[in-house]
Amino acid sequence: MSSMTTTDNKAFLNELARLVGHSHLLTDPAKTARYRKGFRSGQGDALAVVFPGSLLELWRVLKACVTADKIILMQAANTGLTEGSTPNGNDYDRDIVIISTLRLDKLHVLGKGEQVLAYPGTTLYSLEKALKPLGREPHSVIGSSCIGASVIGGICNNSGGSLVQRGPAYTEMSLFARINEDGKLTLVNHLGIDLGETPEQILSKLDDDRIKDDDVRHDGRHAHDYDYVHRVRDIEADTPARYNADPDRLFESSGCAGKLAVFAVRLDTFEAEKNQQVFYIGTNQPEVLTEIRRHILANFENLPVAGEYMHRDIYDIAEKYGKDTFLMIDKLGTDKMPFFFNLKGRTDAMLEKVKFFRPHFTDRAMQKFGHLFPSHLPPRMKNWRDKYEHHLLLKMAGDGVGEAKSWLVDYFKQAEGDFFVCTPEEGSKAFLHRFAAAGAAIRYQAVHSDEVEDILALDIALRCNDTEWYEHLPPEIDSQLVHKLYYGHFMCYVFHQDYIVKKGVDVHALKEQMLELLQQRGAQYPAEHNVGHLYKAPETLQKFYRENDPTNSMNPGIGKTSKRKNWQEVE
């Protein structure tokens, strides 16, 4: 930790309080706990959590932290799954200040909605809601949006998503602060919007919503991953279509993982797909889905909107352990989910201090709550679950609906398996069930924490030309597992593989064995959850981090790199 004296820290904290107000500064460890603890795992100490209320306040807080030689950890929704939004242990060489951007949730629609300007606390849900009346959509819909994830958090971690045509979150237009080689804080405006010259002019103009159409330039820089549709169609490529450390997708704020303080990003929006249709496909032979994927990507004129895979085992786990999530979204809508996740986080933090309550009390309570309701999945889905091991949820739109239906009818005249055309309710519930799967494994581990060691969650991208996508583990690894849960974005070849580990197994050693197998298969990991503190960043990604943050003052240690100032290694 920092050698700064208690007196110096007191003066520093007084300065932060002066900048944002006492009510927007937390120093009590009990009150900062939910900001210091990760969504799934990871935690550490922090000197303070500060909540600036304007971009200009954020700039002044950053300057104060740089002057006082503090580590800066930018945090929005804290929904990351790989510990990248929180401190990691207590072996840092300086004090940590967490800057929460939740109050900075403005959104500016550019033109007729073709582009937007998102601020540090803008959520995917608020963006989706603002665009809906305009017939537009953001990069990502139902998924991260349901738990209150931020738009800029997605950009900084080039997060993925289920929408085949949109690729990972990406932009080349952003406004960010960088600590340069001399330890000086600088503001860089690459938004392509005329905002003035000084930080005060630039940030005040954004804070006061004084952007005019004439200020916005269109100079050819990209505000989404424009090339993704070509990459995902290349079924002979020996590389994945997308993964976090792809050097071609690292650009300033995009992929910076907190190594820059991002004030705003400019993003493209997408025309909402009309006349959508879900086809529910089942088979007992993985090669059938391989053929479907390869044919659609190589030959269909219309790319799918989405193509989601679920194995029977995760279908079952999600049916039982994702039921309350399913019902809440189905009955209350996605707009209530951030509130419930926030409430759960606060309740967990409070109950942790009460000895009377067992760990994971809220998870156990919500699990019991779900049992009170009748079966929630449509009969035809249940029938397909009984008949088939592998499930593909194929969503098409426009002319793609007829194209897919015609081809699937012909294909299943000779292929093992079958499909049915979903009613609107079946299609909605099928995708909602797939969404619930993402949290079901975590719920299982929480409810059965006395019986299982942990959950090992891997997030992988396979080579586009890989035909052996379905994993077969060697017996010495398989014997250490209670459940193997496979689901993912099948057209993109991005899989989430959650392993429930038997009690007493060394999870860290098991993970290393798993990653070695993935390396042998030519897979890249992580695919869309980013390295956080759980994965080692490849050298190209480490180089990108060092370029963005030469003094290693912003989110140090990310990707298992040095936590020390100026990237010094521990002797």
State where each predicted segment sits.
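Glycine-rich N-terminal segment of FAD-binding domains in flavoprotein oxidoreductases
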Residues: 30-32, 36-104, 118, 138-139
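Structural signature of FAD isoalloxazine-binding scaffolds in flavoprotein oxidoreductases
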Residues: 51, 81-105, 161-184, 259
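Anion-binding (especially nucleotide phosphate/pyrophosphate-binding) glycine-rich loop
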Residues: 89-98, 103-104, 109-151
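FAD-binding subdomain of flavoenzyme oxidoreductases
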Residues: 132-287
